[in-house]
């Protein structure tokens, strides 16, 4: 059902060196044209554009289902965050 994948996990100390490594790895993936996604709850360099590139139309489906499940704007706000807003996942 899915193409072969690989998980590249960088856990460890929250330091400048770790952040530089994560940025370097994602930069190299971008340069090589390798598709990838990143764990939401970990250190990442996600942007609205990166999320759209990684997930494509699934972003629209996410927002549609989010509106279906949380049809009240106050509920959507309760289950929101600046991260979701900035990534276009609370549209």
Language-model features, listed with the residues they occupy:
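Activity-critical C-terminal alpha-helical subdomain
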Residues: 16-23, 27-91
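C-terminal substrate-recognition/cap domain of FAD-linked oxidoreductases
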Residues: 1-20
